[in-house]
């Protein structure tokens, strides 16, 4: 039996670059990540996913996809109109219709993404001094580029300014 080669095919395939996380051009390590493990849908000031209509959910996931293209640090310098896209508040706000969930680590820094108009995505990040630190039990590293989503805030009730 003869072994046939398709040299045109092999030549063409060799021109297609191979993606790799080891390439200098790869930006996987700087793209922010979203985590829903602390999501709280039990407070009346916030909403659950089922409370948002299809268009609102589509907008939310389009924003998450867009925000995933950069680091959290990059988003602190971006604006949507006159509002920063991403803000870290450090502490839970004094004036809020939300209550501080009891299951969150006390070290967290509260933050939010501005989605549109009054709509905010509220959560937290870990402090810079925990970044790359190894957790004593899991042996995994903390990552300051992860946004932990806690609340959906459709009416800007997390950080009351008026």
Give a label for each model feature.
Residues 1-115, 128-162:
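Basic, Lys/Arg-enriched alpha-helical interface segments
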Residues 118-127:
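Catalytic nucleophile-His microenvironment captured as a short glycine-rich beta-strand/loop
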């Amino acid at each position: 039996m003869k072994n046939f080669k398709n040299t045109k095919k092999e030549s063409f395939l060799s021109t297609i670059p191979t993606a790799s996380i080891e390439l200098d051009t790869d930006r996987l390590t700087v793209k922010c990540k979203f985590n829903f493990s602390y999501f709280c849908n039990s407070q009346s000031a916030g909403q659950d996913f089922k409370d948002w209509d299809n268009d609102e959910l589509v907008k939310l996931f389009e924003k998450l996809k867009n925000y995933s293209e950069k680091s959290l640090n990059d988003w602190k310098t971006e604006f949507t109109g006159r509002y920063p896209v991403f803000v870290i508040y450090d502490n839970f706000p004094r004036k809020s219709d939300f209550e501080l969930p009891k299951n969150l680590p006390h070290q967290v820094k509260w933050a939010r993404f501005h989605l549109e108009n009054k709509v905010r995505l509220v959560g937290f990040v870990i402090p810079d001094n925990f970044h790359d630190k190894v957790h004593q039990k899991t042996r995994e590293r903390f990552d300051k580029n992860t946004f932990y989503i806690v609340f959906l805030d459709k009416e800007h009730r997390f950080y009351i300014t008026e």
